[in-house]
Amino acid sequence: MAKVLYITAHPFNELVSNSMAAGKAFIETYQQHHPDDEVKHIDLFETYIPVIDKDVLTGWGKMSNGETLTDDEQMKVSRLSDILEEFLSADKYVFVTPMWNLSFPPVVKAYIDAISIAGKTFKYSAEGPQGLLTDKKVLHIQSRGGYYTEGPAADFEMGDRYLRTIMTFLGVPSYETIIIEGHNAEPHKTEEIKATSINNAEKLATTF
């Protein structure tokens, strides 16, 4: 039995969001074909994720030295530890994001910072950093109103590129994508683009 974290970063649901519609289709089909697997939904817009700030950095330093943390430091450090342990307990991750300002919503970066921890998801060695998530799988479902996979705007895309890069850095050997794009550039194709993405999501869910 595998554990899947379904990690969404959109303020709207599948009735409004193309990425959420594809994500919903993926998860429902996945559960039909993998009934014994556990699926946990993490809505990053409804989840408290401490940013790495002065309290966190000071708290980590105090922990290393065996010192007492303040209440704020303890609360933030403990919450980040819980997020990390939940992430480590899973086998597969499905990220659902829109493209915002060429990337993704800031809650995604906060979450990635929470799980990118030396000694847990990667380590330093004589050969350089080594990823430790060598038995995990990732799917990224992202919607983009324009076209960024190819063409003159391709170099501007920094959302999927960043997520792919950080997951490679963390050692993840399998990274797949479902990209939904062009519905704002060509509004007359919106329904066709959405239907294609849902179909692709349902197909991938059977083998992921």
UniProtKB/Swiss-Prot annotation:
Binding residues for FMN: S17, N18, S19, M99, W100, N101, L102, S143, R144, G145, G146
Keyword terms: Flavoprotein, FMN, NAD, Oxidoreductase
Cofactors demanded by this protein: FMN
GO molecular function term, any single one: FMN binding
Database matches in Gene3D superfamilies: 3.40.50.360
Entry EC no(s): 1.6.5.-, 1.7.1.17
Catalytic activity: 2 a quinone + NADH + H(+) = 2 a 1,4-benzosemiquinone + NAD(+); N,N-dimethyl-1,4-phenylenediamine + anthranilate + 2 NAD(+) = 2-(4-dimethylaminophenyl)diazenylbenzoate + 2 NADH + 2 H(+)
Cofactor, how bound (note): Binds 1 FMN per subunit.
Assigned protein family: Belongs to the azoreductase type 1 family.
Record note on quaternary structure: Homodimer.
The protein's role, per its UniProt record: Quinone reductase that provides resistance to thiol-specific stress caused by electrophilic quinones.
Name of the protein in its database record: FMN-dependent NADH:quinone oxidoreductase
Biological classification of the source: Bacteria, Bacillati, Bacillota, Bacilli, Bacillales
Gene that produces this protein: azoR
